[in-house]
């Protein structure tokens, strides 16, 4: 086969045995004959344009292939080239800050190469740039030292934010016979050579790993550190841990993407992998537009957030089959950074589109449909993806721990949480942040319904709170009680009106309103409230709950005396305190700093105590 347009093609090797022939085409599913000897999930190139595909079923010498590109123009009898390897990703310096499609093709490089906003068919560009020089510094590995899978042998400063640690591939071992001196190298240059049983092996900075196979670890550890999101309602009521799994189901327009993006911008993770899977192209372009401008401060240095982020963009107008691959590509990249000892967060937006891709492929294969037409193996596929999260002890030396946290957005049609994808996901994940259409319509964002959401990591995090914020756990319990009580009271209020309630119930209603409007609600697009550090969250809670306790005490202790304290009396006397309570969220953590905010909150607590003492006297 001649090379076309100067692009080198992999079919230059004329091996007739390695060809099969197209037998039938049905959308992204191609059937090929004369394919005996090929393996499940083997990568193939279909047709004269060499479209990337993957074998998903074998019968006799017929293979069913799902193609990750547009199949228009493929005809019966076209050659199918077997590559003999599974669908894999390239791991090495150059991942962060770049944007890939579902099968890890670098979109920026393709755009520069072709000057087109669309990806041409059969384009064959390496995932990581081959001509860039990276500065390699060897670690304490010398010639003659023994090295096994997962050991660190060098560091590349990929950018000023992330140190890219060079790992031995998991299954490698041997005695070092050569290690490159410090200097600039390309990803394909040999930087390490080992010998084992008389066989020499050479390693470059580049590793290739099959996406459907989880990377091995020494052991899984229980998670014990919170994934702080900067969103008050999530950090206080429904915390997630580093290494946890979370689902954000919600109807359209409830703010799933804004929560995912807020997590990517402000969470306490070291690396973010953002997978846009079958969502709008505008959402990915928004990420590309916003992230380079946002900064994060680490060890006193301000850096662009894009330096810790990699994007896997597979928008709704890209081929369906690649949606399935994009989730696996994202999780494999995450596991690679986890193995370096980093805490990684992976956002999948949205897993429903991924399930729909499974449904479409399954329909074309004429498999037996289960609930709502989804394939019977939907639950198993979802589980195999979510179970790759977790906090782990990494392979190799030196000892290090890493974690992968998965946050999956789910968009059930019509916001119905009994949809099969949502139901299957909720059986697997540990944290459920349920978004509510009614709250979103009232413009209460983040629109997380505090009555149906839950987190199963509460107990795992108790030690962390005991050490750092001892007063927090009782405060959280109290908040949940107040919000639950308010829900029960709201029905009575609708029947008989507010005036006929007991005084303590009036206080409960007012404090719940204060909590909802000034604590749970948060404006992602304001400088003071787009990110709320945990000390501010705890301080705000403490003051609001203290106000509740003092009000109830004042009412209950004077109930029998002549000058009764009622809610109206408190409201009239405490106008200033109430105003200060509701303006606590306007304190800007960046401008004011931690010490000033804490001092202000303590001062407010003192003023409040003094005001209540005056009332009761």
UniProtKB/Swiss-Prot annotation:
Activity regulation (record text): ATP hydrolysis occurs at the interface between the nucleotide-binding domains of subunits A and B. ATP hydrolysis triggers a conformational change in the subunits D and F, which induces a shift of subunit d. The c-ring is subsequently rotated and results in a continuous proton translocation across the membrane.
Family annotation (SUPFAM superfamilies): C-terminal domain of alpha and beta subunits of F1 ATP synthase (SSF47917), N-terminal domain of alpha and beta subunits of F1 ATP synthase (SSF50615), P-loop containing nucleoside triphosphate hydrolases (SSF52540)
Any GO CC annotation of this UniProt entry: proton-transporting V-type ATPase, V1 domain
Alphabetic keyword roster: ATP-binding, Hydrogen ion transport, Ion transport, Nucleotide-binding, Translocase, Transport
GO biological process: ATP metabolic process
Family stated for the protein in its record: Belongs to the ATPase alpha/beta chains family.
Subunit structure as annotated in this protein's UniProt entry: V-ATPase is a heteromultimeric enzyme made up of two complexes: the ATP-hydrolytic V1 complex and the proton translocation V0 complex. The V1 complex consists of three catalytic AB heterodimers that form a heterohexamer, three peripheral stalks each consisting of EG heterodimers, one central rotor including subunits D and F, and the regulatory subunits C and H. The proton translocation complex V0 consists of the proton transport subunit a, a ring of proteolipid subunits c9c'', rotary subunit d, subunits e and f, and the accessory subunits VhaAC45 and ATP6AP2.
NCBIfam families: PRK04192.1 (NF003220), V-ATPase_V1_A (TIGR01042)
Family matches, as PANTHER family: H(+)-TRANSPORTING TWO-SECTOR ATPASE, V-TYPE PROTON ATPASE CATALYTIC SUBUNIT A
Protein's UniProt name: V-type proton ATPase catalytic subunit A
Gene name in the database record: VHAA
């Amino acid at each position: 086969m001649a090379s076309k347009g100067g692009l080198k093609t992999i079919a230059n090797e004329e091996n007739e045995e390695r060809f099969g022939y197209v037998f039938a085409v049905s959308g992204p599913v191609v059937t090929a004959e004369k394919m005996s000897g090929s393996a499940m999930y083997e990568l193939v190139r279909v047709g004269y344009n060499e479209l990337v595909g993957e074998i998903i079923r074998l019968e006799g010498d017929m293979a069913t292939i799902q193609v990750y590109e547009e199949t228009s123009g493929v005809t019966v009898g076209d050659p199918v080239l077997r590559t003999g390897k599974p669908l894999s990703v390239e791991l090495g310096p150059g991942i962060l800050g770049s944007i890939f499609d579902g099968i890890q093709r670098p979109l920026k490089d393709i755009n520069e190469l072709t000057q087109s906003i669309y990806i041409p068919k059969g384009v064959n560009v390496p995932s990581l740039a081959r001509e860039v020089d990276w500065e390699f510094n060897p670690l304490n590995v010398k010639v003659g030292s023994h090295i096994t899978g997962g050991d660190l042998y060098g560091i590349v400063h990929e950018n000023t934010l992330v140190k890219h640690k060079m790992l031995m591939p998991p299954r490698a071992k041997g005695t070092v016979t050569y290690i490159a001196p410090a200097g600039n190298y390309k990803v394909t240059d040999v930087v390490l050579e080992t010998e084992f049983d008389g066989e020499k092996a050479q390693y470059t900075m580049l590793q290739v790993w099959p996406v459907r196979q989880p990377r091995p670890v020494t052991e899984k550890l229980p998670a014990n550190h919170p994934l702080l999101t900067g969103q008050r309602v999530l950090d206080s009521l429904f915390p997630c841990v580093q290494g946890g799994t979370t689902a954000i189901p919600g109807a359209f327009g409830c703010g799933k993407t804004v929560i995912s993006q807020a997590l990517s911008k402000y969470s306490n993770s070291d690396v973010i992998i953002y997978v846009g899977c079958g969502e709008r192209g505008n959402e990915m372009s928004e990420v590309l537009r916003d992230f380079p401008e946002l900064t994060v401060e680490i060890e006193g240095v301000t850096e662009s957030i894009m330096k810790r982020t990699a994007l896997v963009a597979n928008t709704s107008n890209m081929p369906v089959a690649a949606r399935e691959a994009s989730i696996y590509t994202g999780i494999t990249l995450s596991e690679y950074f986890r193995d370096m000892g980093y805490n990684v967060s992976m956002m999948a937006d949205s897993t429903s589109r991924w399930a729909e891709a499974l449904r479409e492929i399954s329909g074309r294969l004429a498999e037996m449909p289960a609930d709502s037409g989804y394939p019977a193996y939907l639950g198993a596929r979802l589980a195999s993806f979510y179970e790759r999260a977790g906090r782990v002890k990494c392979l190799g030396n030196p000892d290090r721990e890493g974690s992968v946290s998965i946050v999956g957005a789910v968009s059930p049609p019509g916001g119905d949480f009994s949809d099969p994808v949502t139901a299957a996901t909720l059986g697997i994940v540990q944290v459920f942040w349920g978004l509510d259409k009614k709250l979103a319509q009232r413009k209460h964002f983040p629109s997380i319904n505090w009555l149906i959401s839950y987190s199963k990591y509460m107990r795992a995090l108790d030690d962390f709170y005991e050490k750092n914020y001892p007063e927090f756990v009782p405060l959280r319990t109290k908040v949940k009680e107040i919000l639950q009580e308010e829900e029960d009271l709201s029905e009575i209020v609708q029947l008989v009106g507010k005036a006929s309630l007991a005084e303590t119930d009036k206080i409960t209603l007012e404090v719940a309103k204060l909590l909802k409007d000034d604590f749970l609600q948060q404006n992602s697009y304001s400088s003071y409230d787009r990110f709320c550090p945990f000390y501010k969250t705890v301080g705000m809670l403490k003051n609001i709950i203290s106000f509740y306790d003092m009000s109830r005490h004042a009412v209950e202790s004077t109930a029998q005396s002549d000058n009764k304290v009622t809610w109206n009396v408190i409201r009239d006397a405490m106008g200033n305190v109430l105003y200060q309570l509701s303006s606590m969220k306007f304190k800007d953590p960046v401008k004011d700093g931690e010490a000033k905010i804490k001092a202000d909150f303590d001062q407010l607590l003192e003023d409040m105590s003094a005001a209540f003492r005056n009332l009761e006297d």
